[in-house]
Amino acid sequence: MKSLQLLLLVLMVCLLTIAPLNAQDQPPTEPPADGGLDPAPVGTAVPLPTRGARPASFMITQSDRAALHFFFQALPQGETALMRVVGNEIANVRALFLGDLIDFFPVDDNFYGLIAAGMEQPTGRNNPLAVYVTFTDGTRTTLDANVEIVLGSFIRQNVTVAPDRGYLLDIETEQSELARLESMIGTYTDERLWDETGFQLPIMAALTSPFGAFRTFNGTLNTRHTGWDIRTTLGVPVMASAAGRVVFAGTLAIRGNYVLIDHGYGVFTGYAHFSTTHVTRGQEVAKEQVLGTTGDTGRTSGPHFHWELAVNGDWVDSIQFLEMWMP
């Protein structure tokens, strides 16, 4: 009997070892260490992202002089995708999607545009996209399509805040900071400031708390995680993910010492919790230029780094953006 019990115990241990946890349904093994948007890193580290190969494109619609192609079939909440318009003698291309005006950027003989869905965008098949193509002779054509938005994959986290940190649960502070940032990422620079090497992580270190996580603080305050956390220590140099222009460099309540960079065509990257910053508003920065050093400023209980990315005014998954093929 003892031999049988021992055998059953060994089998149970093996099964528990190999069975993966479903992050969508399983809460984290321990709550975040603080009460903010960006807790000290928790959970298992995620592998560093790698840029994908060029995917196949699908022609969605066409006129007699231009055609619209998608590099995607459906758009998950919180993600970014790529579109392409091909044709002869095209001068410029713009699109309207979910109230956002999207400028396409030229690469060789094609025009490419970034399309994004916010992490709380309702799902559905019939999301109208209108693409306006202007030709060199001044004539125009419109290419109409529908974009399907599907559910994103996000985890849930319950966070307990100590009584002496109750000020972190102030919803007005949360909303005020988000509104301030959204007024910046909602602007548009009709210029591509990044180069063909694309974007990269600001710190080459383990990824931890993911984008889009549903967070409930003390059972009352509900928030969403607008970026990814990167495990680090104090004083590590932070690099610009791509070339761009600094539109904010200062201190925020939640994000602490913070830098926001405009990369053009609706793409912004945000860097939070610096101990020191080395750039100023209006400054042009190169890819891999050091912006400052990591710290624990703002709403955090320990050194870590929060990196976020916005496209067309929406916070999107910065790691998915890195993994997406870009021309």
Positions of PLM-derived features:
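Positively charged n-region of N-terminal signal peptides that target proteins for export
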Residues: 1-6
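Zn2+-dependent peptidoglycan hydrolase active-site motif and core
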Residues: 226, 241-275, 303-308
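Bacterial N-terminal signal peptides
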Residues: 7-17
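Cationic-aromatic interfacial patches
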Residues: 24-145, 151
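Surface-exposed, glycine-biased beta-strand/turn segments
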Residues: 143-255
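Conserved, short, structured surface segments that act as functional micro-motifs
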Residues: 257-260, 267, 283-327
